[in-house]
Amino acid sequence: GSAQAGATFKIDDTKWISIGAGIRSSFSAVEDKAPAGDDWSNDFALDNARIYLNGQLHENIKFEFNTESIMSNSANDFFVLDAIAKFEFNDLVNIWVGRQLVPSDRAELNGPYYHSTYEFNKTPFYMNDQGSYTAGKYGRDDGINIWGALTADKKLTYVIGVFNGRVGGPDADDNLLYAGRISYNFLDVEKNPGYYTSSTYYGKGGDILTVGFAAQWEENALGGIDSKGVVQPSGDFLGYSVDLLGETTLGNGAVATIEGEYKRFDLGGVASGADDKLGMFEGDAYTGTALYLLPGKVGIGQLQPYVRYTYNDEQSGSSQDRDEYEAGINYIIDGHNARVSLMYQYGDLNSKGRLNYFNATGDDVHAIKLGFQMQI
């Protein structure tokens, strides 16, 4: 998701502009990840650095413009993350045009800043993260979304979109990427800008129980020449997922949160890795998280211990499967705007990585990480 916070400057009764910023930085120590191969790595990283700009030109016309760092030290490490013209009419139909989040699972629509844990998405990435140029970064693409609520009580929501998808490669016909998401709020309705989501409201959103279904499809999105120089037939990408979020405030003031997701990717007969640019995942993926926000403050914040498990079951063979156990604690100072996270991880996600499902190698390793997040 994207923030709509910071300083707001009112021009008149209908026109305004706001500016904000967000930073996420971390330290990680991973077993056997040092260049020597048998020592722990020790790495500081700037994971995200964003500038937010939002505004309204007319009561029905808004815009959103956000920048991001690509986590490098090059001179051109900032790029346009979002550039959206928003035409918002009523609860039923609203239209966003430009570079924006493609409809997908909750983890992707949360983005890093509105997830319940510091490392926000451990399951394989959808097709919208495989695009060309900067439009393929962080789940964005250039296109159009239509979103709204299908019921008067706003419990049933939807978003559907059409995007560039993968440009070039095997897609000689320049096919578009089609995406959609529908969700139902069984209890209180989640309140987020547009079709964005969050993975926790720290007890301030009421009693939450929401189930969402998302899907993406692009014809001839995969294929090309594999790593051995063999021409592979093109194949269609089909991905879909089901996610659940539950949250409630208990009698003692504590907040219990659970989140889960199932994801399925089909590469249309093209083997994972048999592509000139992609080593995409094909198979089933599962993840689940349970969090408990303790009542009362410790210093300036609250403690939130959690556990999480992720399993990515690659159908090409068990050697490309990977899983991870994670236990950690968040120190919540100001919700998603200021928090510190300490986590321990064990599995082969840190050694095999999250992108290559073709010929990745790695053992189960231990990892300790510390993350800092702040935004305004």
Q: Language-model features: where?
A:
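Predominantly the C-terminal beta-signal and adjacent terminal strand-loop region
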Residues: 336-370
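Sec/Tat signal peptide C-region and signal peptidase I cleavage site
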Residues: 1-5
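Outer membrane beta-barrel
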Residues: 6-192, 264, 281-296, 302-325, ...
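C-terminal structured "cap/appendage" subdomains that terminate the fold
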Residues: 322-336
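Outer-membrane beta-barrel "beta-signal"
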Residues: 178-189, 362-376
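Detector for outer-membrane/organellar transmembrane beta-barrel domains
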Residues: 12, 183-315, 323-325
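Extracytoplasmic loops and strand-loop junctions of Gram-negative outer membrane beta-barrel proteins
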Residues: 33-36, 125-130, 223-229, 271-274, ...
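A generic beta-sheet turn/junction motif
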Residues: 153, 251, 298, 333-335, ...
